[in-house]
Each structure stands twice: as structure tokens, then as C-alpha cells.
């Protein structure tokens, strides 16, 4: 889903 792509763009700290 598109949500997955959004998560990839957000840096994981």
C-alpha cells in the first residue's frame, strides 16, 4: 500500500 512508501521516506530514529 502507499502507507509503506510513506514509512520508507520517514527516517527511523
From Swiss-Prot:
<dbReference type="GO" id="GO:0005576">
    <property type="term" value="C:extracellular region"/>
</dbReference>
<protein>
    <recommendedName>
        <fullName>SepOvotropin</fullName>
    </recommendedName>
</protein>
<feature type="modified residue" description="Tyrosine amide">
    <location>
        <position position="13"/>
    </location>
</feature>
<keyword id="KW-0027">Amidation</keyword>
<comment type="function">
    <text>Has myotropic activity targeting the genital tract.</text>
</comment>
<keyword id="KW-0964">Secreted</keyword>
